[in-house]
Amino acid sequence: MAYKIPFPPRQPSASSHLPLTLISLEDWALVTLNGPDRVKYLQGQVTADIEALPADSHVLCGHCDAKGKMWSNLRLFHRGEGFAYLERRSVLDSQLAEIKKYAVFSKLTIAADSEAVLLGVAGFQARAALAGVFNSLPDAEHQVVQDGETTLLHFSLPAERFLLVTTAAVAEQLVDKLHEQAELNDSQQWLTLDIEAGYPVIDAANSGQFIPQATNLQALDGISFSKGCYTGQEMVARAKFRGANKRALYWLEGKAGRVPQAAEDVELQLGENWRRTGTVLSAARLADGTLWVQVVLNNDLDADSKLRVRDDATSQLAIKPLPYSLAEEK
């Protein structure tokens, strides 16, 4: 079967209702880092402890400015003889320029990889479908597997799913093998699963706006508070040790007449009135009409708070529990 990226769009589904689905990830971009100074350089740029990152693990970390605000978050992992990371395509150019600023003084090459194909595999029996294609698959304990020219990443949240960094030839073989049993969908389905997982989505509209803790990166093991210096470290540490962070990422569910855009605010009900608050990171309307919104709000909100999409009197949004704990931040 001939394939073209992006795959034809369908309304996305929650993980509990998702059939086997092959997902094109056109809204994400891949960057590679190679060279003898790659570990040392990255260690001084991102919030995670790169020196301690095993070859079979991946991590969601922040790349911050001097004030501790994230240019982007990065899904970072080993690939080949170097590192690679995934980020939203909308922030690629600006974030890449920032992380390359001081690379001229180091022995490494940082570059966007426009040749690699990014695919997601999720839904019913995703593991069984891939088992017939690859020699070995990652799991919760060994999250990254290299199979020839393909790097496979495993995600446990919100349910087992896989991300493939591969070649056009392997992607074509995969589509050809699975297209009769799998649905095809575009990257909005992967975005929806990230919202359900509580993984913060940083697009261009929100670049440079949030410290990592405001998007729950500390709860996702994306911040090391014991590693050496990195850009923005002082502000990130102050937010933890002085309790300076007053925000958190929330998952809202409900209905609305429209899907809010990144960087919009939402409205919180206070008595008979509504007050604008927060910042939308991402949102998706599911196949059943339900609206999901990922939003940064004050971290002391009551669990039964009533919210709505801005200027939409018909909208109703409620807080859904995330699949991980923020207890250590409270």
UniProtKB/Swiss-Prot annotation:
InterPro entries referenced in this protein's UniProt entry, alphabetically: GcvT/YgfZ_C, tRNA-modifying_YgfZ, YgfZ/GcvT, YgfZ/GcvT_CS, YgfZ_barrel
Record-level GO cellular component terms: cytoplasm
SUPFAM superfamilies according to UniProt: Aminomethyltransferase beta-barrel domain (SSF101790), Folate-binding domain (SSF103025)
Presence of keyword Glycoprotein: no
Pfam families cross-referenced by the UniProt entry: YgfZ_barrel
Entry keyword annotation includes Transmembrane helix: no
GO biological process: iron-sulfur cluster assembly; RNA modification; tRNA processing
Gene Ontology molecular-function annotations: folic acid binding
Cross-referenced HAMAP family: tRNA_modifying_YgfZ
Protein name: tRNA-modifying protein YgfZ
Classification lineage: Bacteria, Pseudomonadati, Pseudomonadota, Gammaproteobacteria, Enterobacterales
